[in-house]
Amino acid sequence: MPKSRRAVSLSVLIGAVIAALAGALIAVTVPARPNRPEADREALWKIVHDRCEFGYRRTGAYAPCTFVDEQSGTALYKADFDPYQFLLIPLARITGIEDPALRESAGRNYLYDAWAARFLVTARLNNSLPESDVVLTINPKNARTQDQLHIHISCSSPTTSAALRNVDTSEYVGWKQLPIDLGGRRFQGLAVDTKAFESRNLFRDIYLKVTADGKKMENASIAVANVAQDQFLLLLAEGTEDQPVAAETLQDHDCSITKS
């Protein structure tokens, strides 16, 4: 998308959610998570496709989503039971990180779209959250409850942020294993600058790395963090069928990092 159109889309998004965020800046009361049977793995798709997208086309309202953008083909949804977490979800039927559509050369840059929506999280925290403490994650097939791609936009855990502060991106021009565990798991890192993040299909980089290692995409889990000025670190964990690795563990949806 040309930068001018991306800027228009982002400005529309900002304007569309200001009213919704205004009330959230007061106090957030979070209901307890109910004890429920195994989740319907199509529930998120039904919400976004049947309610948010169709409702928007009929009435112009986004509910129950926060925003629907047909130009970019995405919706933003406030995660249930978490005070600050948002999800970016494609309007197209894309099952998850393993979906071949993600690595097509003309595929939508959903990761950068998610990063552009980080202000939804920071606004709920009175803009007290530095960008370096925002993390994007995608879980593997065997560590998720939904079979519609959703990118978690949330706060970094304090331990994750502390570990990533010591990263020298010049050491990660190619894939390299981090010297320490993150969330008790081993991750590999690849540094990208803002221009590459915005213009490059990082899902293609992930696919090439995972297949070169003889692993399966459905077991891959990824995260993206802003570790320095104009520098991001793409993180990859290659789990197995029996030992899934959920990148979401690098996040803290209560955003305790802002309260320490």
From Swiss-Prot:
> What reaction does this catalyse?
a CDP-1,2-diacyl-sn-glycerol + H2O = a 1,2-diacyl-sn-glycero-3-phosphate + CMP + 2 H(+)
Asked whether the keyword Cell membrane is assigned, the reply is: yes
Q: Which GO terms describe its cellular component?
A: plasma membrane
Its Gene Ontology molecular function terms? CDP-diacylglycerol diphosphatase activity
Which is one Pfam family of this protein?
CDH
This protein's membrane topology, according to the annotation, is: Single-pass membrane protein
Q: EC number(s) per UniProt?
A: 3.6.1.26
InterPro entries in the cross-refs: CDP-diacylglyc_Pase, HIT-like_sf
TM segments?
A: 10-30
Q: State what protein this is by name.
A: CDP-diacylglycerol pyrophosphatase
| Gene that specifies this protein | cdh
